[in-house]
Amino acid sequence: MQLLQSSVIAATVGAALVAAVPVELEARDSCTFTSAADAKSGKTSCSTITLSNIEVPAGETLDLTGLNDGTTVIFSGETTFGYKEWEGPLISVSGTNIKVQQASGAKIDGDGSRWWDGKGGNGGKTKPKFFYAHKLDSSSITGLQIYNTPVQGFSIQSDNLNITDVTIDNSAGTAEGHNTDAFDVGSSTYINIDGATVYNQDDCLAINSGSHITFTNGYCDGGHGLSIGSVGGRSDNTVEDVTISNSKVVNSQNGVRIKTVYDATGTVSNVKFEDITLSGITKYGLIVEQDYENGSPTGTPTNGIKVSDITFDKVTGTVESDATDIYILCGSGSCTDWTWSGVSITGGKTSSKCENVPTGASC
């Protein structure tokens, strides 16, 4: 009898253990987190992470760094952030083969109006940067709807990252928002940004360093346009193999721009601006300037950064009457081998201050 009872107990325990195994594996496969703390502590226990209506506490980062290879992250509901003056970031994601997505109807709202004071990163309140995609390699970010970043939107330092159909809407910051760059790219390779929609008050795209970068099918409204630079003065001062194409820039200070730092060294090469349409530009339609110092132009170009093998092809549109159509200020001998085709920017003034314009281009 004792032997029979022992056998029954053993069989019952064994069956319970077997039944528990699928439940445990399912938990590892998919997790839903409703707090930033739980997401941080449990992020490596699941292959699919759903972030549901998370309220990130003031002064904290929604920390999704060091994810397991192949993790999928889904933003669901509304993601919000507590108020504190600090540098951020509000969100940080890293890992390999990561997919960052959002559920239908989701939004990520920085509520930047709490920080906006017209000074951006140049003074006033200390404002947190929004989304660090650093070491987010062989990965993708798709379909995010982002609103009201306090300052910079995406800081990108990654390899093989695809960003598709992302919206950054800072239109509420027209009066007081400042330095709300959408995509800042540095020390990165093989970055592809496709189908971005941006309403902001600074660069729609700014590439400070990196190679094999594409930006296509973009819509940029209200900011400073599509920029290479500023290049120079950093540890990495090379921009090469960049294509910016099939995009619209409207109601912005600049259309397309290359800016390099005064008295610095570096390289800008094999950069193509193709099929770019401009309208409502208030400062410069097309600008290349090699005189940037402390964030402002000096009017005196230097030639330590070579700007070569540059293509402006079918960059067309209009600027406001008090704006300048085209402005090229190159250092002596530093702007070479440009291809200039189908460029037609009208409505503004013709600059009398262009210098060292390369053969084939016009100013």
From Swiss-Prot:
It comes from Aspergillus flavus (strain ATCC 200026 / FGSC A1120 / IAM 13836 / NRRL 3357 / JCM 12722 / SRRC 167). Disulfide bonds join 31-46, 204-220, 330-335, 354-363. Belongs to the glycosyl hydrolase 28 family. Glycans are attached at residue 162. Residues 1-20 form the signal peptide. Its EC number is 3.2.1.15. The gene is pgaB. Transmembrane segments: none annotated. One of its GO terms (molecular function) is polygalacturonase activity. GO terms for cellular component: extracellular region. This is Probable endopolygalacturonase B.
